[in-house]
Amino acid sequence: MDEECRNCPSLCETRTQVVHGYGDVGADFLFVGERPTTQADAVGVPFAGAGGRDGNGGLRRMLERLGLCDVTSPADAPALENAYLTNLTRCRDPDRRPTDDEIDTCEPYLNAEIRMINPEILVPVGERALTELGTEYTTTPADALVLPDDHATRIRGRGFELVPMIDPHEQTDEQTQTWLETFAQLMASDYRQTKGRQER
């Protein structure tokens, strides 16, 4: 992956570094956010410091509770098992969300990661990721894919099953617990049979 990408000139001026995907390259579960967090931009690991009511790593705690992240591993180098983390865009502007053009420009990187990882389950984290992944990998119209309605639901798609979540920093404790219970049930099921099904 290109560590010196210059495809989005304005983002090149605001980023600290290009933040590509991170985690287990043989993972079944691929988590996709919208853009790098502030801490991710600093350390180069997607979702670093993301979410939680205290702003201290809500997604990481969720992964730990599911057994997908070693509790003892450092924040800037989490030990992930069966999980891979990435974003729609690789660079951060601290003052705004990415434009549609910037997401389109980064799409080849995301597509390359999806092909490389070949996951069973895609986890869109946040509304933008749900819209982008849902449009690409399901037959559901984009305007029918919304959060919080689709939070912690299982959406069958073309080659992947999607399990959307609200951004961790926006989740209530109840929403977090609901998503964890749904995902734990999925992990205990024969989820690998979802490949190739073409439904909602």
Identify the residue ranges that each predicted region occupies.
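A polyanion-binding, active-site-adjacent surface
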Residues: 1-200
